Amino acid sequence: KPNATREDGSDGWYNYRELARELIPWLLDHRFTHVELLPLAEHPFDGSWGYQTTGYFSVTSRYGTPAQFAGFVNACHRMGIGVIMDFVPVHFAANADALAKFDGTYLYEYDSDVGQSEWGTCNFNYYRREVCSFLSSAAGLWMDVYHCDGIRMDAISRALYWQGDPNRGVNQGAVNFLRSLNHGLNERWPTGIYMAEDSTNFLKVTAPTRYEGVGFDYKWDMGWMHDTLDYFATPFGERPGCYGKLLFSMHYFYNELYLLALSHDEVVHGKKTIIDKLWGTYEEKCAQLRTLYFYMYTHPGKKLNFMGNELGHFREWDEKKELDWGLMKYPFHDSFQKYFAELGRLYATEPALYDGEYNPNCFEWIACESRDEGVYAWLRKGAGQTILCVMNTQNTAHKKFPLYLSFPAGAEELLNTEAPCWGCLLYTSPS
């Protein structure tokens, strides 16, 4: 099935009831299948975005009551939207009124240097069965009590390896815990979606536990994200030298079940927003943003986007402020959110874009050596259908560009990124 998720940082502007009223129609209009919520377990520091948890069995009271949160989940379900909860099983807030030195000793955390994370939080000790049981129960709460449809687990690379450093070796206790957790979740809620934020090369993260895998359903493709954003941030004249960045993901894509994520981490801390990372003038950024998302939605793998990406948001995310909805009065930003919705519609209605996406026989490069022209072309296949995807990443048009197919084919245009309906300000060769 197609899966396009919107990551949502519920930041205090709406309570759970208001969020249901405002958010769900937007999700439907833009063809999202799921909404992923940043951690809603209780936490004291707004600036942690929920990733420094103190109350693992408490829904934060910032946005309403537990019953109101359950109502939000039910409202999403009535409209066919799944809810994925962000869960933090690796580290917890160092606050004295929470789990840190809970009984005056290192009860939940390690008692050595590995007990402290890079964020100043405490790392869970997976070699204590009581701690593993605590975390498994906390994860199950979201599925059992609130009927969430899946869990995204944060900072898994910091669990798989000691301090997230492969040079320090594998943390076998953490690996065993994650296997047990995923096995238990899949046993009890087999239709749930369980995904890992993991930037390491650890093997079999998405392999079933019965095959000695860690048992996640999906793993964020951090390599695809970095290479894609690096390429589109490169000046046009220098792009021939890094042409391979947009090819590399398909060299390893079938090693795991990858999900393509442009998340909250990419639009904060001076990194700039997605559109603002792109090279060029305002007009060139606008044209390239359509191309980048064309590439994302036609590349194999499920999709995840942080809120605001669909607006072409220029200001970095600030948990103290709402999104710049005033952008919608500008032609490009209004047309881009409609373009984003059209990509979602195309993804949901063209089976070749999701059927067999983890089958290497369902993808084929057609043009992957056009370094100077900046052109890429590939086939997506599935459900008896074949879609040809062509992308020009340079700022010059190609009136003619030969492509050779191994079979006779007619052609129907499904999407043109430079069509007038998208409010184009600059003509480039269409994707």
Language-model features, listed with the residues they occupy:
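Acidic, Ser/Thr/Pro-rich beta/coil linker or hinge segments at domain junctions
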Residues: E418-L426
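Conserved alpha/beta catalytic core and glycan-binding cleft of carbohydrate-active enzymes
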Residues: H147-D149, Y161-K320, A348, Y354-L403, ...
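Active-site groove signature of glycoside hydrolases
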Residues: A138-Q163
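Conserved, mostly hydrophobic/aromatic
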Residues: L37, C76, W142, M153, ...
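Conserved small/polar residues in nucleotide/adenosyl-binding loops
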Residues: Y427-S431
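Acidic/aromatic-lined carbohydrate-recognition and catalytic surfaces
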Residues: K1-Q116, R128-C132, A159, V170-L185, ...
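Catalytic cores of secreted or luminal carbohydrate-active enzymes
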Residues: S335-A352
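Non-catalytic positions within long, well-ordered alpha-helices that form the structural scaffold/packing
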Residues: L28, M143-D144, Y297
